[in-house]
C-alpha cells in the first residue's frame, strides 16, 4: 500500500483553506500571549509544530499564503536597497527637558498658549522614553501594508519586510471598529538580555559588538536581509498615531484603543494630574530604571486631552503638547592612558581619550571624545588623569571632569597641534571656530577617504557595494584622488584587488554608472559641503532645480531660504567658489553625472505660502498636489497652525478643516486651489 506524505494529507481544498485560517489565528494568539502578555499557553515545541504545519500547507498551496501569515515573520529574500517613503504627517522630534524647572516651564507655556488659569488642573500621560528606532506602521482595513523608519521626519526608508519579523507587531489588527487607515508610530528596541546575547554571538563570530541596544535595534531594522532581522528578538512599543480617525478623547484612551486592536503599548504609561504629578512620575521611573528589561533614557510627558493637543499644535520640528524629560547621564571613574588625534572628513582634528576600560550602562567604554582644545584647557585634561566619564544621551562617551585631587604630578598636557598628525600639513583654526582643521584638503588621506566614503554612502549617491575597504584600496593604489575619479574607473582597475572576481567588478562599475542619474538632493548632500545635511540639501534641490543654478546662487538668495542661515550660506558659497571644487564639478559633468530633480521654481507663484491638504481630492492625488505647490515655490505641511496660509479641503475633510475655520485661515475648494495654482492669487 502506498504511503501518503504529509503534503498529500493537507491538499484537500476546503479542509486546507479552513485549517490554514485556523492555524494563522492560533499562531497570532500564541504570539500575543508570549510576547505581549508574558503568559504562554503552550510550549515552544507545540508552537513550532503549529508553525511547521502552516508552512507545509502554504508550500503545497501557495494560493493560501496571505499577507498576514505568521510564516512571513521568518524573513524573505534580501533586498537590493531600501526605497524612500514620505510620511503623510511629519514624524516630529520632541523638545528636551533636563531639569525639573524646565518641566514646570513646559506647563507654564501650555497655560499661556491656552489662556488657562492655575486653578484648572491639566491631565498628562507619562510614558518611558524608549531608546530605540522610531518607525511608522500603516494599516489598511486592519492589514499591515507598510512600515518605514522616521528618517528626517518627512522622508524615511521602507522596512516592511523587516518589521514583519518583529514578533509583537500584529500583521493584522483584531477587535471591532477597525479604521480604514491607521498610521501608528512607535519605537523598535532590543531588550537588554537579548542585546547582551547578540553581542556575545557577534564576538564569538569575530564581528564587532554593537555599542548599545539602540544601535543594535537600528542596525537590525536597516538590514537588507529580513532573515537576519528575524533571528534578532526585536520588540516594538507604540506611542502615538499619524493619520487616523478616532473617537478617543484622550491620549490614554487612544493607547487603550491601540491595545484593543492588538498593538503593543507601554505597560508603564501613567495618567497623572498636574505637572507636579508628572514630576513625581518621572522621579519614580528614574528610580526603577535599572529594574526594567529594556533601555530607556527618560520619560515623555504629553497633554492627555487630544482636543488640547490639536489646539496647541506644533512648531516646525516638535509638538507644543509634549516634552521629553531626559535622565542624567550615567557616570564612571577611569584613567586617561593616551590622547589620540583623529582626522575627520572635513579636516577637523579631534582629540580622543584612550581610557582604562570601564563598564558604563552595560557597555565597556575604552574611548571618549574630548571635543576640542578649548574643552581640554577649560577642564585642564592631561594624559594620566583620573577622570569621570559619562555617556551623553547614553550613547557617546565623554570626559566631564578631572579628579584633580588624584593627580600625582606626572600627568602630561597635550598642546594644540600645528600640523596634521596624518599628512603633516599645516593645522589651524578658522575665524570664529573652536575646531582645529588640517589644511591639506584632499591631499590628506583621511579627508580624501572619508569624503569619498561619504559621497558613495547610502544616503548620498548610494553606490551599492563601494564601501570603505574598496575605497581605501583605490586610494592606496593611486586610482582615486577625488570623487570625480570614481567615474573613470575600469574593470582592470578593480581586478587589481585581492579576491576580486569579474562579476563583482562588473557590479561595482554598474553601481557607479547608475549613480550618474541620482537625485539632485542626494548629489548636493554627497558633495560634503559643511553645514549642509540631508534636509538642507533637499531644500536647496527643490529651490534651485539644478547644480548649475545652485553654483551661481548669491548669498542673498541663499539666506532667504528656510533652513539656510548666514553660516550655511557662506559655507555653500565658499565651496562653489573654490577652484579645486569647480574643477571636480566640471569633471563630474564631463563624466556624465547629471543629477535629476523636478524643478522647483525660484520666486514661483506660490513662493512663501504654506498649504495644508485635508480630505480626498477628486482630480489630484495628495502627492501630486504637494508637488504642484512645491514646484511653484510653496510649502506643504501636515498640520494646521497660525502660520498656515491656505487649507485645501476635499471630500470627507476632517478636524483640520474645523481648526482652519477656528483660526480664520482661508479654506479652498479643489476648484479654487486649481485657479490659485494658475494665477498665484493674482486675478
Curated annotation (Swiss-Prot):
Pfam families documented for this protein: BRCT, DNA_ligase_aden, DNA_ligase_OB, DNA_ligase_ZBD, HHH_2, HHH_5, Nlig-Ia
Name the positions where Zn(2+) binds: 420, 423, 438, 444
Reactions catalysed, semicolon-separated, are: NAD(+) + (deoxyribonucleotide)n-3'-hydroxyl + 5'-phospho-(deoxyribonucleotide)m = (deoxyribonucleotide)n+m + AMP + beta-nicotinamide D-nucleotide
Cofactor(s) the record lists: Mg(2+); Mn(2+)
PROSITE patterns for this protein? BRCT (PS50172), DNA_LIGASE_N1 (PS01055), DNA_LIGASE_N2 (PS01056)
The kind of enzyme this is, by top-level EC class, is ligase
Q: Which residues form the active site?
A: 129
Q: What is its EC number?
A: 6.5.1.2
- From what superkingdom does this record's organism come? Bacteria
Q: CDD domains, per this entry?
A: LIGANc
Q: Name one GO biological process term.
A: DNA replication
User: Where's the BRCT domain?
Assistant: 601-683
Q: Which residues bind NAD(+)?
A: 44-48, 93-94, 127, 150, 187, 302, 326
> Which PANTHER family does the record cross-reference, listed alphabetically?
CHROMOSOME TRANSMISSION FIDELITY FACTOR 18, REPLICATION FACTOR C SUBUNIT 1
**General function of this protein:** DNA ligase that catalyzes the formation of phosphodiester linkages between 5'-phosphoryl and 3'-hydroxyl groups in double-stranded DNA using NAD as a coenzyme and as the energy source for the reaction. It is essential for DNA replication and repair of damaged DNA.
Similarity section: Belongs to the NAD-dependent DNA ligase family. LigA subfamily.
Q: Which HAMAP family match?
A: DNA_ligase_A (MF_01588)
Its recorded name reads: DNA ligase
Origin organism of this chain? Trichlorobacter lovleyi (strain ATCC BAA-1151 / DSM 17278 / SZ)
Q: Point out the gene that encodes the protein.
A: ligA
